[in-house]
Swiss-Prot record:
The keyword Lyase applies. It comes from Staphylococcus saprophyticus subsp. saprophyticus (strain ATCC 15305 / DSM 20229 / NCIMB 8711 / NCTC 7292 / S-41). Homodimer and homotetramer. Residues from neighboring subunits contribute catalytic and substrate-binding residues to each active site. This is Adenylosuccinate lyase. Its EC number is 4.3.2.2. Catalyzes two reactions in de novo purine nucleotide biosynthesis. Catalyzes the breakdown of 5-aminoimidazole- (N-succinylocarboxamide) ribotide (SAICAR or 2-[5-amino-1-(5-phospho-beta-D-ribosyl)imidazole-4-carboxamido]succinate) to 5-aminoimidazole-4-carboxamide ribotide (AICAR or 5-amino-1-(5-phospho-beta-D-ribosyl)imidazole-4-carboxamide) and fumarate, and of adenylosuccinate (ADS or N(6)-(1,2-dicarboxyethyl)-AMP) to adenosine monophosphate (AMP) and fumarate. Belongs to the lyase 1 family. Adenylosuccinate lyase subfamily. Pfam families: ADSL_C (PF10397), Lyase_1 (PF00206). It is an enzyme of class 4 (lyase). The active site is at 141 (proton donor/acceptor), 262 (proton donor/acceptor).
Amino acid sequence: MIERYSREEMSNIWTDQNRYEAWLEVEILACEAWSKLGDIPAEDVKKIRENAKVDVARAQEIEQETRHDVVAFTRQVSETLGEERKWVHYGLTSTDVVDTALSYVIKQANEIIKKDLERFIDVLAQKAKDYKYTLMMGRTHGVHAEPTTFGVKMALWYTEMKRNLERFKQVRKEIEVGKMSGAVGTFANIPPEIEAYVCEHLGLDAAPVSTQTLQRDRHAYYVATLALISTSMEKFAVEIRNLQKTETREVEEAFAKGQKGSSAMPHKRNPIGSENITGIARVIRGYVTTAYENVPLWHERDISHSSAERIMLPDVTIALDYGLNRFTNIVERLTVFEDNMLANIDKTFGLIYSQRVLLALINKGLAREAAYDKVQPKAMESWETKTPFRTLIEEDATITDLLTKEDLDECFNPKHHLNQVDTIFQRAGLE
């Protein structure tokens, strides 16, 4: 991932240095496991643990000759050891090391993403509580429907991200898995005890069955989950972009002192952060196809997935980490124009209360069809003539014979739409 959309903590996880360090830890743990079985002298393992070092530049130099990164790595590590070097990579195949270490690196990335998600959820919870009763226009098909509250909108985002957190916890169980089962997964030259020891010490589960590789359905599920999380963020970002339109202006991204919105138009204050999140989500989603195409490897393995994963896995984790942090800050600092929200409710001449009038007439004894046929023409006339809907209702004696002024006051009271907000928040776990 390019530096512009990267945070240092996550980027450092995907460096060659950290990857080789993970490989080395797998190699050393395997030696320790062999020692516990009595196959490698404990003193040799001690020397390997104390003296084995990674030198990325040297390993890459050797790779120019070997054309094999793991062989180059083991030879470079061996250069830092004495006679005990013979035990490095003992009984292992390259993918025992690479796949297990990759899962370990992903686990490190997951710890950061988990913190990102939890912080975002906390910010959404606070925003929901802050604006719990802040009335605003609810829109369906982009058209005014009925009032809701900005807090309910935030509660919706909160519950969606809670679901995403649960999905993330589940996919961690699938992806944080190692394997050290040999060339075709049969443990022909390495006992299962080695795998169990290494995985336990790395905080990984051991794959019950594997070939030379971990199966890539795990990685496809993982990338798809990250893509879904990013798509939820995009959904929220698109909402902010729509609500920041000049004609609506119910919210606005924070605009810093000295910030510029346009090189040509000095007045511009654009939702560039939310637009940025939209683009990042597109990038992450684009990798889902790659992840799925990596699943059908040939027989017990091929390496067609390898080149794709070297690009894909750093990109999706770095991009999601960046996106979660940036969007959390956007939501946390979001300006909410409560007066504009109320003003927008009144823009449609009271038409948004048409269902309340319809239900009131039904409650007075009219059949639904008859009530609908009384209300709809008044609503259409209000649209076309820009006459307040209530005025047209009050001018119709066939309606006012059934509905008193008090009845109409209740129909046209926006606070009616707050009646179940407490219930919604309780159901969302926000009380």
